[in-house]
């Protein structure tokens, strides 16, 4: 009987970090940790506390699938299906743009301008994930918002 190598959390992360680095992934260790946390349904601290925990075949298969997708430059948000933005987590698919950190600056600027103009109604055309309008309504609770989708796929 052949002994399979034991893939512990540490071993998987080290291998993936090197693999991602070779593929030009900007934050190889962080991305490896985020994907492994998604597979194990845990927080990142758990990876360090249980560093010697072996992964089972099902976990390895799911992780391998995620790693392959990320190595092909697919954004983490599309692999995970969600993206945190301001106070919320939004569902994202390839049919919508992934909310970016600089979009938070846009939302804050629009909120300030809306307050200054006394705007009560907001219109978001091409809503996508809804990150912009939802975040604006959080900042402007007295306002009302209207969403217009330009893609049926984004509405799903």
Locate each region found by the language model.
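Non-catalytic accessory regions of SAM-dependent methyltransferases
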Residues: 1-40
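A general structural signal for well-ordered alpha-helical segments in protein cores
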Residues: 13, 32-33, 63, 73-76, ...
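A short, hydrophobic C-terminal helix/tail in secreted or cell-surface proteins
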Residues: 152-156
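Residues at secondary-structure transition points
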Residues: 7, 30, 58, 98-101, ...
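Conserved SAM/SAH cofactor-binding pocket of Class I
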Residues: 102-151
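Conserved AdoMet
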Residues: 36-112
